[in-house]
């Protein structure tokens, strides 16, 4: 529902016009919607475009995550109707979707990844305030929520568009290890900074020392050592998950979900260490699905309709498998990253990706200025969000903040994040760490 809501807000935003992008020559250009979508090149107007993106995309998302959370279904229905009306009106100016006019698969994936990043950035701070519904927060043992999708969705989003999924050589394992160094560095920086300022860490999430960056680094290292063709990744991924799930049912899940911790490093970080197997299996399945659905030689990437149909069909099958696993094998658990959790993330994310691909049929659909900025600086956006979140938590007693103060702080945070990333991008910089 949240991905659909995001896409509807993007479509509504684009119907208003006035967009800024950087062309191949590094020149800023703004498209203002006038008559036949006349393109006007104007310098320094990206600030207005980013501001409109914030007003029509980011701020409404923030409201639906907090004070309007009970109205999310009503809001989605209303936005769907409004976008439908605007789409019908827009089609009068088009003789039909011409080849190359609709969003490509790559653009659809970019929009999906940006939505995931934006939702994550909003939630990691909002969850600390009382106006954020607890049903959206991460579960402690079993169950599902919006925030439970986070790390799994990041792993899958990287897998689907990885070099391995595209059947492109990624070099030897030494190259892979070097590429992992920045993730390890970020993981240690987060560990040192959180320990240095005595920042509150939920130990049951990853463990005492482990964090999200270490999980990504571990997956990258394993993939570098076991580098097999994409068409075989599905089989290996299933084998890894089946073995891990069997281990969980043999008693490992009881240990991982208990408060028992020894003095050794693995025991102190048992959730993060053991769940690597689940996330690696998920990554391998994501590589295989990306190859089979989008990049394989047998796949006609130009056939948007068939690609969308395949995505929704696989998503439906995964939903069925998830229900069966959840009822007859083990309940979904993000904390252990068991097989039901993996199939749940796959089903959710493929469904969301299908929605973004389906929106390519709507004439209004384009990447917004803010989407473009975040897409080119995904990791920088996440790091900035974590930094600001930490600063807010160290200076504000979020639990006792009033609803008005909470919304004001979250709005300022969201706007600052949008403005800074927009400034970085439209000033010609691109923050890459490897």
Swiss-Prot record:
TM ranges: 48-68, 70-90, 112-132, 141-161, 173-193, 206-226, 232-252, 271-291, 305-325, 344-364, 380-400, 404-424
Protein name (Swiss-Prot/TrEMBL): Uncharacterized protein At4g17910
UniProt membrane topology term: Multi-pass membrane protein
Main location: membrane
MF terms (GO), sorted A to Z: O-acyltransferase activity
Keyword Lyase annotated: no
Record keywords: Membrane, Signal, Transmembrane, Transmembrane helix
Cell compartment(s), UniProt: Membrane
Highest taxon above the source species: Eukaryota
PANTHER family listed in its UniProt record: PHOSPHATIDYLINOSITOL-GLYCAN BIOSYNTHESIS CLASS W PROTEIN (PTHR20661:SF0)
UniProt keyword Cytoplasm present: no
A family per Pfam: GWT1
């Amino acid at each position: 529902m949240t991905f659909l809501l995001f896409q509807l807000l993007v479509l509504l935003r684009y119907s208003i016009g006035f967009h800024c992008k950087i062309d191949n020559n590094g020149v800023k250009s703004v498209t203002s919607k006038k008559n036949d979508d006349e393109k006007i090149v104007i310098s320094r107007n990206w600030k207005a475009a980013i501001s409109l993106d914030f007003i029509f995309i980011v701020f409404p998302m923030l409201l639906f995550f907090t004070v309007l959370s009970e109205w999310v279904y009503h809001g989605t229905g209303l936005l769907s109707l409004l976008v439908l009306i605007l789409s019908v009106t827009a089609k009068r100016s088009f003789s039909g979707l011409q080849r190359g006019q609709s969003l490509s698969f790559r653009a659809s994936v970019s929009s999906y990844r940006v939505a995931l990043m934006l939702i994550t950035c909003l939630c990691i701070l909002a969850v600390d305030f009382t106006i954020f519904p607890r049903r959206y927060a991460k579960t402690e043992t079993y169950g599902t929520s919006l925030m439970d999708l986070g790390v799994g969705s990041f792993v899958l989003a990287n897998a689907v568009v990885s070099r391995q999924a595209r059947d492109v050589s990624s070099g030897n394992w030494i190259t892979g290890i070097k590429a992992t160094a920045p993730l390890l560095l970020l993981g240690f920086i987060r560990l040192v900074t959180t320990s240095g300022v005595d920042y509150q860490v939920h130990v049951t999430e990853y463990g005492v020392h482990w964090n999200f960056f270490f999980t990504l680094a571990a997956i990258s290292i394993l993939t570098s050592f076991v580098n097999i063709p994409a068409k075989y990744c599905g089989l290996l991924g299933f084998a890894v998950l089946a073995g891990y799930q069997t281990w969980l049912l043999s008693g490992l899940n009881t240990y991982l979900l208990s408060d028992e911790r020894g003095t050794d490093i693995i025991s102190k970080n048992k959730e993060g260490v053991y769940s690597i197997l689940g996330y690696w299996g998920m990554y391998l399945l994501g590589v295989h699905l990306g190859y089979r659905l989008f990049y394989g030689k047998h796949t006609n990437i130009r056939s948007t309709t068939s690609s969308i149909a395949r995505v929704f069909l696989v998503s439906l099958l995964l939903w069925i498998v998830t229900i069966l696993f959840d009822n007859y094998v083990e309940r979904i658990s993000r904390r252990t990253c068991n097989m039901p959790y993996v199939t749940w993330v796959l089903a959710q994310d493929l469904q969301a990706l299908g929605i973004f691909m389906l929106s390519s049929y709507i004439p209004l659909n384009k990447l917004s200025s803010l989407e473009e900025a975040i897409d080119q600086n995904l990791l920088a956006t996440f790091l900035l969000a974590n930094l600001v979140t930490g600063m807010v938590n160290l200076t504000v007693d979020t639990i006792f903040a009033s609803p008005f103060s909470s919304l004001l702080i979250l709005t300022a945070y969201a706007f600052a994040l949008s403005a800074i990333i927009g400034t970085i991008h439209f000033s010609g910089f691109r923050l890459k760490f490897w």
